[in-house]
Amino acid sequence: MKNKKRLLILTLIACTVLQLQAQVYNEMDEFGNIRQRDENGNAFNPNKRDSTKNNKEVPKGVWAWTVDRKFGDIRKAQLDTMPHLYQNSIYNTGVFGEYNSTGNNYTARLNRIFIDRKPFSEFFFVDPYDYTTKEPEDFLYLNTLSPYTHISYDNCGDKQNGEDHIDAKFGINAGKRLGMGFDLDYYYGRGYYQNQANSHFRASLYATYVGDRYQMHFLGSAYHRKATENGGIVNDNYITHPELETTQYSEDEIPTVLSRNYNRNNSQHLFFSHRYNIGFYRKVKMTDEEIKARQFAQAAAKDKEQREAQKKTEGMREDNLGRRKNEPVKEGPKGRPDNAKIMGDEPGTQKDTPADSTRIKVESQEAMDSLMAEKAKQDSIDATMKKEYVPVTSIIHTLDLNNYERTYNAAVTPDNYYADTFYDTDDEGNYGGVGVNDKYKYFSVKNTFGLALLEGFNKYMKAGLKGFVSYEMRNYKMPAILEGTTEYYLAKYSEHCLNVGGQLSKTQGRTFHFNLAAELGVTGMQSGALAVDFDTDLNFKLWGDTLRLAAKAFFHRTKPSFFHENYMSKHLMWDQSLNAETRTHIEGLFKYEKTRTQLRVAVEELQNYIYYGMSYNTTSTGREQLTGGVFQESGNINVLTAQLKQDFTLGVLNWENVITYQNSSNKDVLPLPDLNVFTNLYLKFRIAKVLLVELGGCATYFTKYYAPDYLPQIGQFAIQKNEESKKEIGGYPFVDVYANFHLKRTRFFISMSHVNAGSGSKEYFLTPHYPTNTRVLRFGVSWNFYN
């Protein structure tokens, strides 16, 4: 395995060298024309003719955007090319360490900051793996002036416990409007503890067409997620107090509750959004990138004309010399013959024709110069202008198709681990006794039709207005048992949803923006569901920098998922009717760039809160009598959140802090740490003016609380319901040190995570009974190519 890693690293380095040393590059101009250039930017000439001596700058423009999932609106976005905190982007615990996980990287996770948690999805089994998921509204679409490739790779450990992650993106345009590409992600974590390996793979293909009247976005994705479930270690003392145990274990020898238990989630997704715009044209100034692209195209056209003219001249010369047919050189005429005569009479004088009164008469050289200067000025302006289509009305259609399949598979189960057993074998008559093979499927097709009156087509239209109607069909499959049998079959269930809604928004300009959206369930299982969202921001100059004030509010009445009310497996089952969950949220944000300060305050009230719970008895050999399910709290729960982000700089010394305070009114149902802290202290400087270096350390800390445990049978974090076995975590700092580098289009880092392992209380748990990895050396590298 080490040889394979070395081979992969050498291959990547070789690819980089080849990219830098290649003699010929293919480039695409703004009109989609492909031409070649050498490494100096000169036009590539296979005949080695010196057709031009001017080095032309090749444009490397890449524009990125996301789209609204409902309407397909384009929203500008930034490519992930920032070197800062690159070393933290590889963790499933988040850039700021704000997520709990089950120890190993790439495992399930849950955000400790409640207001940042995403709402549950219809197929909630994949929610804890959201870091592997790129939803249509989060996917980056590209428009490129030249083919764009991005490759990232990070690694740690060896063939027994290591981790590997590779991410590859590619984008290319066929002309100005049509773009396409792919995005691949592969995660593989073997695990530093027993029975902890996991692997995830995602492949996405996209295509875009962004024309004046017609726009289209297509995204097709396939996912494979596999996680080995170990149920946690059998005794926390192996980590916190090893001296109390008669047997001493190394990290990879500590016994775990489960073995040969797996969660598999496969899914396929198609997203297609398109619209037809009705509007008019106007002239606007081009961006710097577009000006460079036009100049590049003009230089390419001029270069082509010169080559063709030179080729034509050489061809005529060869014809005149008779070289094409090896003919002798003919003697050409040398002047007028001696006997030449002038024929005819000399032409007579003609009458003057009347002047054209429609033409502008230039009386003097000064007037001529003035006209020429005015024309040159207008030509200069026209060279930087382009025609822009201004849409007034849009007709919108969006198709969203999703197909999920989940299997919980266990070859063995510990004695007395489960409290209940509801069937023996699966639908194929296998996995009887201690085996488990639970299967679940979900398929949905959603069509949305919208009509939009767009913002900004004239000075009076300060906001955009949209309306829509959507219809969704859903199909489910899950185990069910016939009376008198011990074998399950996959029962089928169907439901439909008809929703209507609208949106009023202002997104243009720099000072003031707002968005108001509402959606109502009319018929079907989502009848009565309501979502009202509002956000706004105000930006203005204060003491030489931008001050931003923002507010956000929403009211959501959400119906429970099908699997929240109906679920059957070999050892867990519930059949219940839940009320709609209601959430009311108000949030304010203050951000001032000059002092690098950001303050966020939020208040949220929840009613009929839906959550997962589990219970078991703790023994010396692990856990027994496990039960779990979906629960609902009918009372009101209030959550107060205050978060401060404050950065400081003194010369090359930088200090960043994120401090979050939370208070839940019902800690039994919604436990949250009172304080969550992330701090990052580092030196930032350049070597030889080209190599950017960040050298420092960061730490994550949160106060003790009864964090949710993990229920592997449904892949969810669940509240600890048994008072006798409840376990607190927290009060322990996680410290990393790193060196982060950025050289031109390459980022790379080397880091040591959890350098303080083995010190202090040794309570390095992010989930009860699931210890995190100890000290691990990691490295990563990221390249961007524009050819």
Per-segment meaning from a language model:
Residues L18-A22:
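Sec/Tat signal peptide C-region and signal peptidase I cleavage site
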Residues Q23-F271, R275-V362, K541-T546, K744, ...:
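Membrane-proximal, glycine/serine-rich, low-complexity loop/turn segments characteristic
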Residues M1-K5:
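N-terminal secretory signal peptides that target proteins for export/translocation
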